[in-house]
Amino acid sequence: MCSIGEDDFGDEGAAHAMVVESLPLGIVLSPGNCSKCDVNSGELYKLNFRTAECRECFLAYARHKFRAALGAAKILPRNAEVLLVLDGSAESLVLLDMLHFAQTQNTFKRLHCNARVVYVEEQQVQGRDPVDLEALQRLSTQYAPFDFYVIELGALPSSLQRIKDYSPFLNANNELIHKLQKLRSLTARQDYLQQQRKNLICSVAQCLQCTHVFESNISVDLATQLLTAIALGRGGSAALDVALLDDRLSGDVKLLRPLKDLTEQEIQFYIHAQRLKPHFQKGSRYGMEHGETASLQNLTSAFVANLQQNFASTVSTVFRTGDKIAVNSNPEQSSCVHCRSTLDSELSDTLLAIEYSRSVSEAGVSLYKSGQDLEGLAKKRLENKDGLCHACRAIQTELDSGNLL
């Protein structure tokens, strides 16, 4: 029978009132007795609001969170075809290690699914040297029998290659890079890049005939994602942006976030316990080098990171609030052709005011139209059947030339 109680998961409950700094944190290198199994250990792990425990007990706790996320909702069918997205971050390596461990258990405890791994190469888009291919090949050997694939962000799904056949090369005709250069603001570039990445992963899943995709977002990532979605005008789809299951992808591909309940501290402890070596840190994402105030995404990320450092329980509250947002599941509503979110087709006062302001701004010094004319123009824009939601339409307006799609 499972010995890990419900209090081990989710919000910290009464622990919200505790001062984090008053607790001993970090990995205790001095030997001691595990509070769970009472075995003397040379290295104890002390998580916030939990007693110190040995490596084996900590790994059992963290892996149980992963299994509980999938098992509680029963959203992963038996023998499902799963595509795990690897980006070289600590979170994606933890997800890979947990899935591999779950696949190598005995029949009773085994997670029954067929997994493949795809590494999305983003270095060229970011203007950096290609990833260390030898490190990827070592991963594919370590986590056999998983099949490893590589695809470059911005490439066609048909360019998908097995890791053993892949050789990095600079593609001067990468259309995604040219499109990013045409977008005026970093906010628009980061938003556009995120949607393109999601669409590429969906296409790869369809090529490999995978019905489910595993992404490695943890609680702090989803808290950031929730606030960013609202700031960008994607509030209508914010619930799916932080949910365990996101079914907006085309071709009946379902996106799962099985690490959604893990914290940043648990990820770092798991990396230490398993001696994993991340290739990239969170600060190496596209556009992060431009500073905190360069985009809405950077600013929101810095805000949540500050909360995580000083008021860790607040981040959990933000994340759990996103869990409680109801999903708009009207099958009759059309979807955005770019991000697959439900179209905000109803003419709201807020959207009308935004388009009215945009019309005035574009008219500039040559403004000669009356208020009624401008309002009519704003309504016409909203009623335009371009197939884009409000947020994607905002990206379109940032383009110097060309079409978003």
Swiss-Prot record:
Keyword Repeat set for record: no
Keyword NAD attributed: no
Keywords associated with the record: Cytoplasm, tRNA processing
Entry's Gene Ontology molecular function annotations: nucleotidyltransferase activity; sulfurtransferase activity; tRNA binding
Listed GO biological process terms: protein urmylation; tRNA thio-modification; tRNA wobble position uridine thiolation; tRNA wobble uridine modification
Localization per Swiss-Prot or TrEMBL: Cytoplasm
A Gene Ontology cellular-component term: cytosolic tRNA wobble base thiouridylase complex
Pathway membership, UniProt: tRNA modification; 5-methoxycarbonylmethyl-2-thiouridine-tRNA biosynthesis
Residues in coiled coil: none
Function: Plays a central role in 2-thiolation of mcm(5)S(2)U at tRNA wobble positions of tRNA(Lys), tRNA(Glu) and tRNA(Gln). May act by forming a heterodimer with NCS6/CTU1 that ligates sulfur from thiocarboxylated URM1 onto the uridine of tRNAs at wobble position.
Family: Belongs to the CTU2/NCS2 family.
Record's protein name: Cytoplasmic tRNA 2-thiolation protein 2
Species the sequence originates in: Drosophila melanogaster
